[in-house]
Amino acid sequence: MPFPLNRTDTALVISPSEFRIIGIFISICCIIGVLGNLLIIIVFAKRRSVRRPINFFVLNLAVSDLIVALLGYPMTAASAFSNRWIFDNIGCKIYAFLCFNSGVISIMTHAALSFCRYIIICQYGYRKKITQTTVLRTLFSIWSFAMFWTLSPLFGWSSYVIEVVPVSCSVNWYGHGLGDVSYTISVIVAVYVFPLSIIVFSYGMILQEKVCKDSRKNGIRAQQRYTPRFIQDIEQRVTFISFLMMAAFMVAWTPYAIMSALAIGSFNVENSFAALPTLFAKASCAYNPFIYAFTNANFRDTVVEIMAPWTTRRVGVSTLPWPQVTYYPRRRTSAVNTTDIEFPDDNIFIVNSSVNGPTVKREKIVQRNPINVRLGIKIEPRDSRAATENTFTADFSVI
């Protein structure tokens, strides 16, 4: 016997073909979400170099997305192919709790990650405050924040019910009781408007920093200092990734927030378009790994190593042009060179760069103003017998 809807007045009549389309879409999101987020977790387990404090936000995002993709999406797909919600009331509450909890964690992690990027790029003096302890405390706060909002419906502040498209469960957005309305308004403000403000501020300041730096280049100071082409490419990439991340957040959660706000005023969408906000939100589990992790060279390199260990691995491959830069060995031993690497711009220098012959080594670039990048170095000696001058090519990925 089908589990009855709690609010039959808002349930939509959907054709079997539309149910199948929803089922196929959710199945694809489930497969991509499981594989993509699982790869991120494996990368953290295999490669120590990606375990920088800020990347723990990416790991947190992957864990929460993996949980809902493994446990929640199969329930949605099975219900869609059955043309109705096939699990009981307890299953509805468990599903809604898992998915809503994952959504809140994802939203707040987006906000925390964007603010950390703002500090790293625009507030270099405070960069050292982003330590592993600080990040772990922030993650604990995010999970506690999510637990508060997702446990509240289980204890009487609003409730979990089947959604208007009867293949999933969520908060009773369409409830008109005092508890339902107050909870909906509070969630929209605390879980959407507040983190969205942080994201817009952070990426807006990053863009402003880029625009101001471009303006300074056109002044007198620009005539006295040369900015390498690859640094300009990095800055453009920072701007692009910032817009990409903000757009991904808006696409995933803005339609859902709008529908939830409209539900307060008893506005109902009487066709299958009501399913789109839910589908957009659920798709975020599938594309988050590609936006937040696979734009990072370290992640990509390890994924290539995991997926194709039989191929020749080329570290640091990206779309950025590789500049030719000269380095001069300070001293040479039988196995290792300790080098000073000089760039045309004296704002940039490499700390403790060491190579063992013509091999690949990933190091850090420390730049005082304003972009911080990681450096992948591929040593290409002009003469294997020469000890005075070599060249290397470099690839940069934005932190």
UniProtKB/Swiss-Prot annotation:
Gene Ontology biological process terms in this record: phototransduction; visual perception
Keywords, in A-Z order: Chromophore, Disulfide bond, G-protein coupled receptor, Glycoprotein, Membrane, Phosphoprotein, Photoreceptor protein, Receptor, Retinal protein, Sensory transduction, Transducer, Transmembrane, Transmembrane helix, Vision
Similarity annotation: Belongs to the G-protein coupled receptor 1 family. Opsin subfamily.
Main location per the UniProt record: membrane
Topology of this chain in the membrane: Multi-pass membrane protein
Protein's job: Visual pigments are the light-absorbing molecules that mediate vision. They consist of an apoprotein, opsin, covalently linked to cis-retinal.
Cytoplasmic side: 44-55, 116-134, 211-240, 296-399
Organism: Mizuhopecten yessoensis (Japanese scallop)
Compartment annotation: Membrane
Gene Ontology terms, MF aspect: G protein-coupled receptor activity; photoreceptor activity
Name by which UniProt lists this protein: Rhodopsin, G0-coupled
One Pfam family per UniProt: 7tm_1
Extracellular topological domain: 1-17, 82-95, 159-182, 264-271
PTM summary: Phosphorylated on some or all of the serine and threonine residues present in the C-terminal region.
Transmembrane segments: 18-43, 56-81, 96-115, 135-158, 183-210, 241-263, 272-295
Taxonomic classification: Eukaryota, Metazoa, Spiralia, Lophotrochozoa, Mollusca
Modification sites for N6-(retinylidene)lysine: 282
